[in-house]
Curated annotation (Swiss-Prot):
Species the sequence originates in: Natronomonas pharaonis (strain ATCC 35678 / DSM 2160 / CIP 103997 / JCM 8858 / NBRC 14720 / NCIMB 2260 / Gabara)
The encoding gene: argG
Xref: HAMAP family: Arg_succ_synth_type1
Principal place of residence: cytoplasm
UniProt: ATP binding residues: A10, F11, S12, G13, G14, L15, D16, T17, T18, G117
Lineage: Archaea, Methanobacteriati, Methanobacteriota, Stenosarchaea group, Halobacteria
Single annotated GO MF: argininosuccinate synthase activity
UniProt enzyme class: ligase
Subunit relationships: Homotetramer.
Name of the protein in question: Argininosuccinate synthase
Length: 400
């Protein structure tokens, strides 16, 4: 038996990963390839395609359910208000979860290598390999390393009789998981092109209809919908269906990829939009001004690491230390209204609210704790003093 006995391949059953199967044997010298498909909320049709293709290739095929782990990571992202250039990181967060699951199978099956079918232009190659290169297994990227083109893959599949009908997987490149659905490619790559309505599956065009829902949080984690406790996966799936019917969660952005490429991306993410908006509204109620300002910096750094797929980085641990310190007060409920394609917070309640109705009222003389309105006179005199002084100095100098 050779030193290169078995390799675990991230397997979708699509063109890229299908041609990788024989190439890993012919070009890299592996005796056996095993395919691993990780469930992070893809459509059932994708698993059927992977299973049928694996069977046609006589490929040992493993399916791993990682939806619970992925949902937990998504809720960590909610606590960090995680978003990258308007995108709630669905694909980015899924990749390290998928990579970890594949690595675990590879070790259990005695593999000496792990492989993926990502190209050398995208982000996924980096996210997968950031996890895998922390192991002692060989990391292989046939599409990137062999410089494969779409045309070559189609011709190669046809010559070898690989189970790819026409070598065409559809007009657009689509990635779906619990947290988001991305649509890219073809005419959508042109920034000036107006996408047709039929690119969307999770969301419908907004109408005049509205709906209000109540989202409950404990320690910053979403835990309930309209008073009913739900597990993370069920809560996300329910909100995707519910909010999607009101057109909530569409994003059309120019995204700066990790390798410096600027690309156009279209996303659908109803549940993510609702939960992120609700969480931010509750934080605004319970955190102090200074905490809110500093947490924006922490959230930004967490989002950058999340986009890079580096959710296990030491920096993320440190950032989450601060986040944990703030989230024990992010407990309460937020009422969200679906209206015109938006998920708008219209009410929020918490026992930790940093708010005093008496102090904020225009109908009371006292502010709070024995402080009266007239006590603000001294503060008002000093406020802006340095700026006034600076302007006088500047004006005097200009007159000379």
């Amino acid at each position: 038996m050779s030193d290169k006995n078995r390799v675990a391949l991230a397997f979708s059953g699509g063109l890229d990963t299908t041609v990788c199967v024989p190439l890993l044997e012919e070009e890299y010298g592996y005796d056996e390839v095993i395919g691993v498909t990780v469930d992070v909320g893809q459509p059932e049709a994708e698993f059927k395609e992977a299973e049928e293709t694996a069977e046609a290739l006589d490929l040992e095929h493993h399916v791993v359910d990682a939806k619970p782990e992925f949902a937990e990571l998504c809720f960590d992202a909610v606590r960090a208000n995680a978003s990258y250039q308007g995108y709630p990181l669905g694909t980015a967060l899924a990749r390290p979860v998928i990579a970890e699951a594949i690595l675990e199978v590879a070790k259990e099956e005695g593999c000496s290598g792990v492989a993926h079918g990502s190209t050398g232009k995208g982000n996924d190659q980096l996210r997968f390999e950031a996890v895998w290169r922390d192991s002692d297994l060989e990391v292989i990227a046939p599409v990137r390393e062999l410089g494969l083109t779409r045309t070559f893959e189609q011709e190669y599949a046809e010559e070898r009789g690989l189970p790819i009908e026409g070598g065409d997987e559809g007009k657009y490149s689509i990635d779906t998981n619990l947290w988001s659905r991305s649509i890219e490619g073809s005419e959508l790559e042109e920034p000036g092109y107006v996408p047709p309505e039929d690119i969307y599956e999770w969301t419908t065009a907004p109408t005049a209809e509205t709906l209000e829902v109540e989202v409950g949080f404990e320690d910053g984690y979403p835990v309930s919908l309209d008073g009913e406790k739900l597990e993370p996966v069920e809560l996300i799936e329910t909100l995707n269906d519910l909010a999607g019917d009101y057109g909530v969660g569409r994003t059309d952005i120019m995204e700066d990829r990790m390798l410096g490429l600027k690309v156009r991306e279209n996303y659908e993410h109803p549940a993510a939009t609702v939960l992120l908006n609700a969480h931010q509204a509750l934080e605004d109620l319970v955190l102090t001004k200074e905490e809110r300002a500093f947490k924006k910096q922490v959230d930004h750094e967490w989002s950058e690491k999340g986009y890079q797929g580096l959710v296990n980085a030491p920096l993320v641990d440190a950032l989450e230390g601060f986040i944990d310190e703030t989230q024990d007060r992010v407990t309460g409920t937020v009422t969200i209204r679906f209206e015109g394609g938006q998920a708008r917070p219209v009410g929020r309640e918490s026992p930790y609210a940093v708010y005093s109705a008496e102090a904020a009222s225009f109908n009371t003389e006292d502010v709070t704790g024995g402080i009266e309105q007239s006590d603000a006179t001294g503060v008002a005199k000093y406020h802006g003093f340095q700026e006034r002084l600076a302007n006088r100095v500047i004006d005097a100098a200009d007159e000379e």
